C-alpha cells in the first residue's frame, strides 16, 4: 500500500460516541493507498457537556460543499467546564496527526500532534473554501472589537530521533522549526460566500 492519499474530498465520515456525545471523524480512503483518518479537537470538546450531536461540534461536515460534502469549522463556546479551566471557546480544526486527550485540559497546543509519513515532494496545495467571521471575537473569555481570521497550512518536516512530531505550538512560532523542510500558508484570508 502506498503512502497517504494526496486528494481529499471529505466524503467519508463515521460517527464516534464519546462521553454521552457523538461526533464525526473524517477519513480518506482511496484505492491503493493507506486510509488516512483526520484528527480534530472534537474529543476535547466532548468533555464540555453531554447530548451533543455531530453538528454541535466545532469540526463537522456540511452537504453544501462545492461538490458533495465539505468540512465545516465553527468556533463554539465550551460552557462552564471550559471557562473553569481557562478555555472558554473551542475552534474547529482538522489536521493530519493525532489529538492527545490526556493533555487537552492542561496544554491544548501540546495535545495537537501534527504529522504522518509522506513520500512525495510537495509542489503545491490547492483547495476551495468559504469563510465568514463570527459575530464576536473572544480573547481570554471576553468579547473584543477584533475580527476573527482563519488559517490553512501544510507543514513538511524531517522526523528525527528527537523530533517525532510537531505540535500546536508551531503556529505561535510563526510556522518555523529547525526540522521544517517546507511550509504552505494561506496569505489571503478574506471573507467570501463563494467557493
Region roles according to the model:
Residues 2-124, 147-157, 164-195:
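Aromatic (Trp/Tyr/Phe) and Gly/Pro-enriched flexible surface segments
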Residues 121-133:
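A short beta-strand element within beta-rich, extracytoplasmic domains
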Residues 131-147, 160-163:
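Extended, low-complexity, turn-rich repeat/linker tracts enriched in Gly/Pro/Ser/Thr and Asp/Glu
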Amino acid at each position: 500500500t502506498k503512502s497517504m492519499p494526496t486528494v481529499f474530498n471529505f466524503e467519508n465520515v463515521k460517527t464516534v460516541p464519546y462521553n454521552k456525545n457523538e461526533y464525526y471523524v473524517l477519513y480518506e480512503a482511496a484505492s491503493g493507498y493507506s486510509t488516512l483518518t483526520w484528527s480534530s479537537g472534537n474529543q476535547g470538546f466532548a468533555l464540555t457537556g453531554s447530548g451533543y450531536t455531530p453538528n454541535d461540534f466545532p469540526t463537522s461536515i456540511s452537504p453544501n460543499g462545492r461538490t458533495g460534502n465539505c468540512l465545516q469549522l465553527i468556533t463554539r463556546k465550551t460552557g462552564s467546564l471550559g471557562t473553569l479551566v481557562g478555555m472558554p471557546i473551542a475552534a474547529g480544526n482538522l489536521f493530519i496527526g493525532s489529538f492527545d486527550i490526556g493533555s487537552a485540559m492542561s496544554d491544548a497546543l501540546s495535545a495537537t500532534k501534527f504529522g504522518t509519513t509522506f513520500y512525495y515532494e510537495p509542489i503545491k496545495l490547492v483547495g476551495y473554501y468559504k469563510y465568514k467571521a463570527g459575530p464576536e471575537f473572544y480573547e481570554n473569555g471576553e468579547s473584543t472589537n477584533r475580527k476573527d481570521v482563519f488559517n490553512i497550512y501544510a507543514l513538511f518536516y524531517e522526523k528525527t530521533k528527537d523530533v517525532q512530531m510537531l505540535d500546536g505550538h508551531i503556529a505561535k512560532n510563526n510556522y518555523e522549526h529547525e526540522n521544517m523542510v517546507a511550509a504552505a500558508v494561506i496569505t489571503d484570508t478574506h471573507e467570501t460566500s463563494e467557493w
